[in-house]
């Protein structure tokens, strides 16, 4: 089996990323153009996992404009064939390692029914010996009646020296 490579995304990856997200319910599918923009403007904080030249994982993340010490993880997707191999965790570790020393927190939003993502985030915090906090952020009234509320998860402070040890 070929090795999995983690790297920054290229604009040419956007189509494959869009398809990967579309195939990863319950993630919200966004336009292809949005993924082009992420690959172009946020490549320093987004990560692609590649196997045999195929995109099999993607993490979209950015440094929060209101909290420059925080990496906000927006979406994480892994191809069904490659799940439960630690790829999602490595995507987040890779994104964190691309940031400067001032980033000490990870934030993400998660719906109450997305128990897999919630468990992943709790385990991620445990792996880094970091605090895990969760609170309501956006209500379904704001997001629309067909969308569950989104809770904000905050993990940290993160000691960057632990990234190499736990990866």
Which residue stretches match the model-derived regions?
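C-terminal "cap" of GNAT-fold acetyltransferases
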Residues: 128-167
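Conserved beta-strand in the GNAT
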Residues: 48, 54-63, 70-72, 77
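A short, internal acetyl-CoA/4′-phosphopantetheine-binding micro-motif in the GNAT/acyltransferase core
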Residues: 75-83, 110-111
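A short beta-loop-alpha structural element at the N-terminal edge
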Residues: 4-17
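Conserved active-site alpha-helix within GNAT-family acetyltransferase domains
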Residues: 112-134
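Conserved GNAT acetyl-CoA-binding A-motif
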Residues: 99-112
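Conserved acetyl-CoA-binding loop-helix of GNAT-fold acetyltransferases
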Residues: 78, 84-97, 119, 123
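A short, aromatic/hydrophobic, helix- or strand-capping loop or linear motif
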Residues: 28-37
């Amino acid at each position: 089996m070929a090795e999995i490579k983690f790297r920054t995304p290229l604009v040419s990856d956007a189509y494959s990323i869009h398809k990967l997200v579309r195939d990863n319910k319950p993630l919200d599918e966004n336009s292809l153009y949005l993924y082009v923009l992420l690959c172009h403007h946020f490549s320093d904080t987004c990560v692609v996992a590649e196997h045999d030249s195929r995109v099999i994982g993607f993490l979209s993340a950015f440094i929060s404009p209101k909290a420059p010490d925080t990496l906000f993880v927006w979406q994480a997707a892994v191809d069904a064939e490659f799940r439960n191999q630690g790829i999602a965790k490595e995507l987040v570790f890779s994104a964190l390692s691309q940031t400067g020393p001032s980033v000490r927190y990870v934030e993400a939003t998660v719906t109450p029914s997305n128990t897999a993502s919630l468990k992943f985030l709790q385990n991620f915090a445990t792996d880094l010996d970091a605090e895990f906090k969760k609170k309501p952020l956006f209500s379904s009234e704001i997001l629309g009646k067909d969308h569950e509320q989104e809770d904000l998860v905050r993990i940290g402070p993160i000691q960057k020296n632990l990234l190499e040890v736990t990866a």
